[in-house]
Design a protein with these regions (language model features):
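Short secondary-structure subsegments characteristic of cysteine-rich extracellular domains
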Residues: 13, 59-81, 213-231, 504-510, ...
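Short, Gly/Pro- and small/polar-rich lid/capping loops
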Residues: 22-30
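Hydrophobic/aromatic-rich, well-ordered segments within soluble, folded domains that form packed cores
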Residues: 31-52, 182, 186-205, 573, ...
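Short, solvent-exposed loop/turn and secondary-structure capping segments
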Residues: 53-57, 153-154, 178-180, 232-235, ...
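Intrinsically disordered, low-complexity linker/terminal regions across diverse proteins
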Residues: 70, 256-259, 280-284, 348, ...
Length: 677
């Protein structure tokens, strides 16, 4: 594709990747499947060898290069934790907390001996309550745990006044996540629903109830969740930021939902009423429905719901029998996994989940060189310049909207590698004399108290990170207009300092472009340069954007991911726009960066071909059919295959690079190719 270079080349940052001419291609030839024409399935051509050489491990429902990198990261983290075991540390130090928590997570024998003992006092206290009033008093007593409450709550930026935090309420209460699992009647969904009923009953029995008692409690929970599903918003509907922003005063909330004792619960949790004067109620219709359900439900149902919440929050931290029962449903039935992860991996993941930033500080000192951060900073600068050029190239946009888009782009807050300041864990106590479950709950209570202390009535801290440094991922946050690239993702196959620009722009470059494009996707475009939910588009430009976005939604909705199942292009719209935009922006940046010193062919491929092969290589994976069904309902990203074979056929440069022509399976006529950014 011919690009117009709007900005002078001297503004492109010099990327410190060494002498590109001498750098390797970064490609692994055994990952390819050259028996397939690139134009018939580029995904298979670029990743078929990888798929063959990396069969799906029994513990995974999906295993791809993302997961492979995560596994390598887990080994690094496990090495850190194993080394910590070799010494004794003073109580209260971060090393003591990490070391003792890891020991607890590895101590299966103690958990198997204890059974449900760690949760039995709380379960008994709830079971002993005779009336609804007594149960509601227990809800207040344990308010921070949210027992029997079918909604989520917490402090976050006020999307129309993003310098301040505000109390947010959102729908919840569905153990299976998506409402579709409760309401759809296709054979696969019905089978999961029936298995869920069995699972509910089994878990109540494992927590000490008779078969008859368990059946009654399971029925109450299932009926409650099914009722909630009827007035819950779909995953797609939850993607509309304007529709999910509804500001209310506390007085209005009480009037609208008299059967939800929000103030009493919040006060008991440590939130003063003055911080509830205004709040955001994400889904008013859901809360109206839930208010009626809460009023009508009897004591026995509320009791079952409270007990079910305890079961859900503890099942992974008690005996193997209980953990395995949970895995049988969520791992095998829902996702198609054949076995659970080994103990060391589960333990490492839990330390990472509960004490991630403490671990991240050690991880970055050991595994993230400053040189990688500098290389990323240069890449990000080049991608920002390129996105500015892509904005200017959009002939359907007015100058006024382009100017506002540039303002937003210029104000991106970039985070790379690790936070500027680390979480203070001094108030968290990890007590090896207590159970694993009790220590997990101590971590959760610490995080909950920390959020209240730092956010209730307080300004937004733009330096807060929403991922740990060792996470293999990246994100864009609209309310701070930030793009974040943790140290964990800055490794092969996303980033290789010894590879040339074709590889790095095709891999990590597209990731950077992807996150930047999120600032201008169907959701992100509704937030201004400061992060406020505020319209900055002319009416005509907004219409033009929506017309183009609708075409993406329709295209991906027509993709069959299984013989009886289509993708949901409306649900995955933001991610599909970011994939396509990321490719366009990074390809343009790649051409900018190599204009004066074009790269040579390597390993039998041109520079442009290597760019697209690097991108596709990121998405190689093997996946079960059950996991495909699960992701179509719950994951806003397209499947790996379609992030390649769905995105690339809309990019002219890919056609030119691989000689794709009419008659090839992936060919789309030029006038039908989609473009937005």
């Amino acid at each position: 594709m011919k690009m117009k270079m709007i900005l002078p080349m001297m503004l492109i940052a010099a990327l410190p990747l060494g002498a590109d001419a001498q750098n390797k291609s970064g490609l692994v030839m055994s990952n390819l499947d050259k028996t397939v024409k690139p134009a018939d399935s580029f995904y298979q051509f670029a990743t078929g060898g990888w798929q063959k050489n990396n069969p799906l491990p029994a513990a995974y429902s999906r295993y791809g290069s993302f997961d492979q990198l995560s596994e390598n990261n887990n080994k690094r983290i496990n090495t850190i934790l194993s080394e910590l075991q070799k010494k004794t540390y003073k109580a209260g130090t971060i090393e003591q907390k990490l070391s003792d928590f890891y020991k607890l997570s590895m101590d299966v024998d103690s958990r198997n001996k204890a059974g449900i003992a760690p949760v039995k006092p709380l379960m008994d206290e709830i079971e002993a309550a005779k009336t609804k009033d007594e149960l509601q008093k227990l809800q207040v007593k344990y308010a921070w745990m949210g027992l029997g409450l079918s909604y989520g709550a917490g402090f976050a930026a006020d999307e129309k006044n993003v310098t301040m935090n505000i109390y947010n309420l959102m729908q919840g209460g569905l153990t299976l996540g998506a409402k579709d699992y409760y309401l759809n009647n296709d054979a696969a969904t019905v089978a999961i629903r029936e298995a869920y009923k069995t699972y509910l009953s089994k878990m109540f029995q494992l927590y000490g109830f008779s078969a008859d008692e368990a059946a009654k409690k399971a029925s109450a929970v299932f009926l409650h969740e099914t009722t909630l599903a009827t007035f819950s918003k779909s995953r797609t509907e939850l993607r509309d930021p304007q529709a999910n922003y509804n500001k209310m005063t506390l007085a209005e909330f009480k009037e609208n939902y008299p059967n939800i004792p929000l103030e009493a619960l919040a006060n008991a949790e440590g939130i003063k009423s003055e911080y509830l004067k205004e709040m955001i109620v994400g889904q008013p219709a859901f809360f109206a429905g839930y208010d009626k359900v809460a009023a009508a439900e009897c004591a026995s149902t509320l009791k079952a719901l409270m007990e079910w919440d305890i079961i859900c929050s503890s099942a992974s931290y008690l005996s193997d029998e209980i953990r395995e029962a949970r895995f049988e449903f969520f791992g095998k039935t829902m996702s198609g996994r054949k076995e659970d992860y080994p103990l060391w991996k589960r333990a490492t993941a839990q330390v990472d989940a509960q004490l991630g930033e403490a671990l991240g500080s050690i991880y970055c000192k050991r595994y993230f060189p400053e040189s990688s951060k500098k290389m990323m900073e240069a890449l990000v600068k080049n991608l920002q310049i390129s996105l500015g050029q892509r904005i200017d190239a959009q002939t359907w946009m007015s100058d006024a909207t382009k100017k506002a888009a540039h303002n937003k782009l210029d104000k991106f807050y970039v985070k790379i590698g690790y936070p500027n300041k680390w979480t203070d864990f001094s108030k968290l106590s990890i007590d090896p004399s207590k159970s694993y479950y009790e220590n997990v709950m101590a971590c959760r209570k610490f995080a909950n108290d920390k959020e209240i202390a730092e956010k209730a009535g307080k300004p937004v801290d733009k330096d807060e990170w929403f991922m740990t440094p060792q996470t293999v991922n990246a994100y864009y946050n609209p309310t701070t207009n930030e793009i974040c690239f943790p140290a964990g993702i800055l490794q092969y196959p996303f980033f290789d300092p010894k590879a040339d620009a074709a590889f790095n722009y095709g891999a990590i470059g597209v990731v950077i472009g992807h996150e930047m494009t999120h600032g201008f996707d169907d959701q992100g475009r509704q937030y201004d340069a400061s992060g406020n939910l505020k319209d900055w588009w002319t009416a005509e430009d907004a219409k033009g954007f929506n017309k183009r976005a609708d075409m993406y939604a329709d295209f991906f909705s027509n993709i069959k991911v299984l013989p009886d199942l289509n993708a949901n292009g409306r649900f995955t719209l933001g991610e599909n726009l970011a994939d396509h935009g990321g490719l366009m922006v990074s390809y343009n940046a790649f051409k900018n960066a190599t204009a004066k010193k074009p790269l040579k062919n390597k390993d039998g491929f041109t520079p442009d071909q290597r760019f697209f092969l690097a991108y596709a290589g990121v998405w190689g994976q093997n996946i079960t059919d059950k996991e495909i069904r699960n992701r179509v309902k719950n994951d806003p990203h397209s499947l790996g295959k379609w992030r390649v074979d769905g995105a690339l056929p809309h990019i002219d440069a890919w056609y030119e690079a691989f000689g794709v022509k009419q008659g090839d399976k992936l060919f789309i006529p030029k006038n039908q190719r989609l473009e937005l950014w």
